[in-house]
């Protein structure tokens, strides 16, 4: 299990946690988000559960409850924290307990947890303040484990998205052309920032990176259903979104009406020290 480089992270790119409007825009269609976004590999869930000292889990950026339901099915009790009331309301309807707040501002009121998780949402959290809050609420030996889906999109789909966005929304923060590189490597600056934030607290073991490879075949309809849930696309007006979907649909048609997307789900993880440095 590799540890993460302690070299200086690449700070040249934007800081996602500062883009609050985008971070809190996913609830515009919470039902679509929950339907279209893929769950996490069962092996990822099982490993985090096995590596945690108990079953009490805090889910940061719980969204509609996708990963919370998976951890509940694995025997955990899960409390979600979610800044978007619309997403939280959907999660509650699926049986997930959720409190509405930005994690950095959330009040734990003395509650402690065995694991703090975050499913493709930790990049919306300040990496230092978030790690410090996690240290506050984790029991000694508890596990901090934010994880992210990293899709390796086919070049044809990237090209169609890039062209469409340059035409209809040149200022969009979503830049699919960056994904032409090996996807996991393209995400390393983000993962390095997460790890550096954990280190800065002085409250955790050296961060590790766990990787889980899998793939999913999307039909044309499934892929076009998921695209509007991507950050940076959630705020497009309907007419511009229609243009993006037309372009994306044409690309899928050229691929035979479906697209196979390899994923690597990456966990950045560390355990809460028994004493702070």
Predicted regions and their residues:
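Class I SAM-dependent methyltransferase SAM/SAH-binding core
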Residues: 64-106
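Conserved catalytic/acceptor-binding region of the Class I
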Residues: 139-213
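Conserved class I S-adenosyl-L-methionine
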Residues: 2-52, 54-61
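Conserved Class I S-adenosyl-L-methionine
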Residues: 3, 184-277
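A short SAM/SAH-binding and catalytic strip from SAM-dependent methyltransferases
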Residues: 114-128
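A short glycine-rich, Lys/Arg-flanked "PGG" loop and its adjoining helix->strand segment in the class I
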Residues: 129-140
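A short acidic, Gly/Pro-enriched loop at the edge of an enzyme's catalytic core
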Residues: 106-116
């Amino acid at each position: 299990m590799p540890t993460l480089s302690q070299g200086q992270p690449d700070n040249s790119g934007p800081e996602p946690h500062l883009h609050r409007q985008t971070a809190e825009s996913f609830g515009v269609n919470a039902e679509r988000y929950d339907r279209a976004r893929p769950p996490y590999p069962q092996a990822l869930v099982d490993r985090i559960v096995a590596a945690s000292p108990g079953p009490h889990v805090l889910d940061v950026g719980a969204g509609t409850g996708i990963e919370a339901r998976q951890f509940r099915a694995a025997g955990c009790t899960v409390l979600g924290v979610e800044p978007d009331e619309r997403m939280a309301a959907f999660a509650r309807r699926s049986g997930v307990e959720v409190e509405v707040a930005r994690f950095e501002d959330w009040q734990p009121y003395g509650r402690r947890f065995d694991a703090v998780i975050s499913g493709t949402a930790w990049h919306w959290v300040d990496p230092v303040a978030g790690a410090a809050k996690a240290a506050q609420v984790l029991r000694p030996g508890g596990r901090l484990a934010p994880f992210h889906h990293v899709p390796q999109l086919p070049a044809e789909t990237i090209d169609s998205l890039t062209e469409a966005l340059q035409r209809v929304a040149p200022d969009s923060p979503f830049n699919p052309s960056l994904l032409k590189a090996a996807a996991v490597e393209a995400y390393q600056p983000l993962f390095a920032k997460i790890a550096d934030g954990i280190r800065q607290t002085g409250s955790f073991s050296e961060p590790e990176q766990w990787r889980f490879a899998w793939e999913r075949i999307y039909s044309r309809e499934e892929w076009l259903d998921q695209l509007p849930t991507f950050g940076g696309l959630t705020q497009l007006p309907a007419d511009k979104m229609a243009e993006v979907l037309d372009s994306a649909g044409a690309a899928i048609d050229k691929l035979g009406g479906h697209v196979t997307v390899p994923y690597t789900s990456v966990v950045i993880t560390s355990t809460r020290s028994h004493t702070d440095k």
